[in-house]
C-alpha cells in the first residue's frame, strides 16, 4: 500500500501480482495461506463486495502464479516428469500462460462481483509504515533465492557443462541442504515448516503415474478413448482433454487427477498422433491447476 500511495486499485492489483509471483516458487496453497490475512486486512468490512473481490482474487492469483514454473504446482511437476523436460522448457510455456490469464481473471472477477468503487484501502499498522530489518540473514536469503532461480532457468546449459543430467532436480536438493548450513534457517524450523503432506501427495502422484504406465492401464484407457474420438481433428482431442481435466479437478484433487490423466494422455497421443504430445500434456498439466469454479 505504501508503494501504491494508498490508491485502492494499484494496491489490489499490486497485491495480486505479488501473490502470483510468490506462488511461482512456493505451493499455491502455502502462498494463499500466507497472503490471506493481509488480504482480509487490506479492505474493511464496510465494503463486502470489494473484500470478497480481494480475498477470492488472492486465491486465484496464487493458482495463476503456480502455472508459471515447474515448482509452482504439483501437476506441473507430474507433467514435467512425463515429458522429461527441464525447468526452462516448462517456463517458456507456463509463464506466458500465467501472464495472459492474470488480467482476464481479474477482469472477469470485477464483472461478476462488482466491487464498490468508493472502497478505501487500509494502511496496515496504522500510520506506521512496515519496515524489515535488512540484516545478513535477509540478504543471504535473497541471494540464495536469486541463485536458485538462475540455476533453474539455465539448468540445461549448466547441467550440460557439468555433465550432469536432471540438474534442475539436483539444485533443489542442494539449496535445501545449503540454507541451514549457511545459518539462514535451522534444521528444526526446516523440519517443522516444510509441508510434508504436499510432498507425500506429490510423490504418491508420481508413483501412481508410473503404476498406470507400467501396468498398461494408461494404454488401455487411451485405447478406449481413441475408439470414441476416432477421426477427430487434433485440436478437438486437445480441447476435449483439457476440458475433461478442468471439470475433473473441480471435484477431485488436482495432483491426483494429473497423476491419473497425464499418463493416459501420453499413451493417447502416442497412439493417436505423437506430434500433439507436448501440446496435449502441457495443456492438461496447466488445466489441472485451473480449478476456479468450486471451493473444493
Residues of each region from the PLM?
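Membrane-helix interface "capping/anchor" motifs
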Residues: 45-49, 184-193, 249-257
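Hydrophobic transmembrane alpha-helices that form the pore/transport pathway of multi-pass ion
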Residues: 5-67, 74-83, 254-287
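Hydrophobic alpha-helical transmembrane segments
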Residues: 9-17, 31, 55-56, 91-99, ...
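Membrane interface segments of multi-pass transport proteins and intramembrane proteases
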Residues: 2-9, 162, 221-232
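Hydrophobic transmembrane alpha-helices of multi-pass small-molecule transporters
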Residues: 1, 89-223
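Transmembrane alpha-helical segments of multi-pass membrane transport proteins and ion-pumping complexes
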Residues: 7, 11, 20, 24-33, ...
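Alpha-helical transmembrane segments of multipass membrane proteins
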Residues: 20-21, 42, 149-153, 177-181, ...
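C-terminal transmembrane helix pair
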Residues: 88-101, 204-208, 229-296
Amino acid at each position: 500500500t505504501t508503494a501504491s500511495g494508498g490508491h485502492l486499485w494499484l494496491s489490489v492489483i499490486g497485491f495480486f501480482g505479488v501473490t502470483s509471483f510468490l506462488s511461482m516458487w512456493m505451493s499455491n496453497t502455502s502462498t494463499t495461506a500466507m497472503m490471506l490475512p493481509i488480504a482480509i486486512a487490506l479492505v474493511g468490512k464496510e465494503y463486502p463486495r470489494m473484500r470478497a473481490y480481494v480475498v477470492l482474487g488472492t486465491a486465484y492469483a496464487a493458482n495463476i502464479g503456480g502455472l508459471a514454473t515447474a515448482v509452482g504446482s504439483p501437476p506441473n511437476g507430474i507433467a514435467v516428469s512425463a515429458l522429461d523436460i527441464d525447468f526452462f522448457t516448462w517456463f517458456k510455456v507456463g509463464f506466458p500462460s500465467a501472464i495472459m490469464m492474470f488480467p482476464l481473471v481479474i477482469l472477469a472477477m470485477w464483472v461478476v462481483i462488482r466491487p464498490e468503487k468508493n472502497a478505501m484501502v487500509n494502511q496496515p499498522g496504522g500510520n506506521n509504515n512496515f519496515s524489515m530489518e535488512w540484516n545478513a540473514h535477509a540478504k543471504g536469503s535473497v541471494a540464495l533465492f536469486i541463485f536458485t532461480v538462475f540455476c533453474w532457468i539455465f539448468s540445461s546449459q549448466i547441467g550440460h557443462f557439468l555433465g550432469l543430467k536432471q540438474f534442475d532436480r539436483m539444485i533443489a536438493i542442494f539449496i535445501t541442504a545449503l540454507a541451514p548450513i549457511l545459518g539462514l534457517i535451522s534444521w528444526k524450523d526446516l523440519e517443522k515448516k516444510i509441508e510434508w503432506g504436499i510432498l507425500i501427495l506429490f510423490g504418491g502422484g508420481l508413483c501412481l503415474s508410473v503404476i498406470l504406465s507400467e501396468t498398461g492401464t494408461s494404454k488401455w484407457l487411451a485405447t478406449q478413448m481413441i475408439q470414441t474420438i476416432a477421426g477427430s481433428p487434433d485440436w478437438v482431442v486437445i480441447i476435449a482433454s483439457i476440458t475433461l481435466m478442468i471439470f475433473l479437478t473441480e471435484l477431485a484433487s488436482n495432483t491426483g487427477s494429473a497423476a491419473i490423466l497425464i499418463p493416459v494422455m501420453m499413451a493417447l497421443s502416442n497412439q493417436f498422433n505423437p506430434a500433439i504430445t507436448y501440446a496435449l500434456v502441457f495443456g492438461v498439466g496447466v488445466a489441472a491447476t485451473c480449478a476456479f469454479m468450486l471451493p473444493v
